[in-house]
A protein has these predicted regions:
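Solvent-exposed loop/turn segments at secondary-structure junctions
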Residues: 32-35, 83-87, 118-123, 149-152, ...
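Active-site-adjacent substrate-binding region
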Residues: 157-184
Length: 233
């Protein structure tokens, strides 16, 4: 277990400072082919179970919504729509990590890197969905995942990343108390050692529909965007 005091992290606040007028946030997808339960008009040619290369229906579409929502808050956002996990799932983190490094080299003003995914919740062949209790429409939940140095590998930024995650979680919880799942800390780095301000964000699960994920990420962005805009200097 990793000892964490949420109250202390909230009191510290995020270490992240976003530069004005330059690219600030990168959204990308290590597993871009991750898709959702087909429903309504959101039917897609599957390349594997709940996966598709069609960016109209996979997590890249959800990334488009997040990028636009954050941009509406005045943030400078880049969205890498490249599919790094197809045709080979193996090595996708190596490929996406190399791409992140290229972005950091090209845009040194970047301060936040979001690797946007959808989760997979299964048990005994039963697929589960996440549900935010909202009055108007079905909506998935969102989870922030923070890698640590618990594996012994180099990762000097994980506590700063956690401070950012706690800051965002608090901002979203204030507006939508059921939207966020608990923050998850893991032993693995998931490329988050490459730069400060790195987070994995999981929107929904394979049991959710695309529209449920879109509603969730839009609500997340509408709260997280203004919170991030307050970090611009």
């Amino acid at each position: 277990d990793i000892p964490v005091s949420v109250a202390a992290l909230l009191q510290q606040g995020p270490a992240t400072v976003l530069p004005a007028g330059e690219p600030q946030i990168l959204i990308m997808h290590t597993h871009a082919s991750e898709a959702f339960t087909p429903a309504g008009r959101d039917l897609y040619p599957a390349s594997d179970t709940c996966r598709t290369e069609d960016t109209n229906y996979n997590i890249v579409h959800v990334g488009d919504v997040l990028a636009n929502t954050l941009a509406s808050a005045g943030l400078q956002v880049l969205h890498d729509r490249t599919i790094y996990d197809y045709p080979s799932y193996t090595g996708s983190y190596n490929r996406s990590g190399a791409a992140v490094q290229e972005y950091l080299n090209q845009y040194p003003s970047l301060r936040i890197v979001i690797d946007l995914h959808r989760d997979a919740l299964c048990s005994d062949s039963v697929v589960y969905k996440t549900v935010a209790e909202l009055p108007d429409a079905a909506c998935s939940q969102v989870m922030l995942l923070v890698g640590t140095n618990a594996s012994g590998l180099y990762h000097p930024y994980w506590e700063e990343n956690l401070r950012l995650a706690v800051y965002l979680q608090d901002a979203v919880n204030a507006a939508h108390p059921t939207l966020m799942r608990p923050i998850t800390l893991v032993n693995e780095r998931y490329n988050q050692h490459l730069t400060r301000g790195s987070l994995i964000i999981e929107v929904g699960s394979s049991g959710n529909t695309l529209q449920e994920a879109i509603r969730a990420v839009r609500l997340f962005g509408e709260s997280a965007g203004p919170a991030l805009a307050r970090l611009v200097q």
